Amino acid sequence: MCGICGKLVFDGQGISENLLEVMCKSFSYRGPDDEGTFVSPPVGLGHSRLSIIDLSPAGHQPMSNEDGTIWLVFNGEIYDFQEIRERLKSDGHTLKSLTDTETIIHLFEEEGIDCLKQLNGMFAFALWDGRQQKLWLGRDRLGIKPLNYYWDGRQLVFASEIKAILCDPDVSREIDHEALDLYLTLNYIPAPWTIFKNIRKLMPGSYLVAKKGGISVETYWDIPVGTEQRENRLTGGAPLEETRDFKQRLYALLEGAVERRLISD
């Protein structure tokens, strides 16, 4: 469990590195092993690290590509990163660490935001593309890792936890009355709402892109619907005629999923 945070402002207002440090400290228990910040207006990124993959200083975040045009803060674990890493190396990419974080950076160089479709894991990340002056926020398919953001039409502030967003004095703490109504009706606040106006949860299987002029949120994955789609997912497209075949395939999928999750340093 790590913590990520950051801010994007295109109106010329500077980004305070001290603010990023305060935001990181607000969830330091999420990442007690290391802390880092990156500031290059109009963007600032912060990270608190819990070391799981590659415990060396090479795993320090925020992390960049070779020429510093792409910067990433990442929380989570990518279970198929080793296969992706080998493919990237064969395509000529030079990777300096053994982290899944660096793998995402180079995969983004190849695929753009479509790289999300190749990631098997639990994650939330923020990626700054300095070439296009765009900030991307991404979240895993099932929303295992949290990611919240504040947008008031001028600035974007994001973090793993809402209390880190509230560390920014520019962020309004106004109550969202629609969210309050939902809470009184349902006894909880469903995503993407939060109790604070203009603070939202990034939905599972979604990404946000922020650029000069505004933000947009898109869905890159959703739960398959329909019997045929579910069976294709379970069988890999092969016909299964007996209940025994389904059991064997399901067992193989579960066994493979558990094996992938045993990767750590």
Where are these regions (language model features)?
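Cysteine-centered catalytic environments shared across enzyme families
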Residues: 1-265
